[in-house]
C-alpha cells in the first residue's frame, strides 16, 4: 500500500515568497522544555476531550493533596462527668476538662496500678522512665500527667508507697468512667474494655496525638527514654521554644 504524502502537507504563506506553495509543516523550537506525560496524553485529542481530560487531572491532583493532609483531632473534649486528679502532693482536685497550659504533654496510661510499690523492681516502667528525665521534660516546657482507670483510693495508696528515689510531682487522673481512655482509643480490648492500655502518649499544645509508645514487658528502657526525648524535643523546636 502506497501512502499519499500530500495528506501530510499544509498550505503555508511565507512572507518572502511571491507565490504560495505547498510545503511540509515543520516546527522547530529553540527553547528546550521538559516533556510531561500529560502533554503526551493530551496531544492529538479533540478540544472537548482535552478539556475534560485536564479537568480530570486537576481533580485528581486536588484529591491527592487532600489525601496527603493529616487531620489531627483534639484528644480531650468536654467531659460529661467530672474526673478526679491526684496531684503531686496527694491532694484531690475535680476537673471537667483537662487544661492544656504547656507546649506539650506526656501522658502515661496505666492499667491496674494496685500493688506493692515499695521496691523499685515492682514499680511500673512508666514511672521509672519518666522519673529519670522528668527535669529534662520540664526544660522543654513539657508536663507529665498519668491517666488510669483505677479509683482515687488506689491511686493515693500506690503513690504513697513509691520509693523515695522515684517520688516526683506526677498528677494522676482517675478515669474510672473510661471517658478519656475511650476518647483516645486507649482501652484494652480484652476484659470488656474496662482497663487502660499501658502506653506513653505525647500530645502537643492543642491536644493532638503526636506519638504513641506502648509499654510491654520486653520494652527496652533506654529505647523508650530516647523515643520520648526525641519527640518532646521536636515539639519544643516546632513551637519555637528550642533552637
Curated annotation (Swiss-Prot):
Principal cellular location given in the protein's record: nucleus
Cysteines engaged in disulfide bonds, as pairs: none
Compartments in which it is found: Nucleus
Region described as Disordered: spans on this chain: 28-50
GO MF, any single term: thioredoxin peroxidase activity
Function: Acts as a negative regulator of the NEDD8 pathway. Has a role in meiosis.
Name of this protein: Uba3-binding protein but1
Organism: Schizosaccharomyces pombe (strain 972 / ATCC 24843) (Fission yeast)
Oligomeric form and interacting partners: Homodimer. Interacts with but2 and uba3.
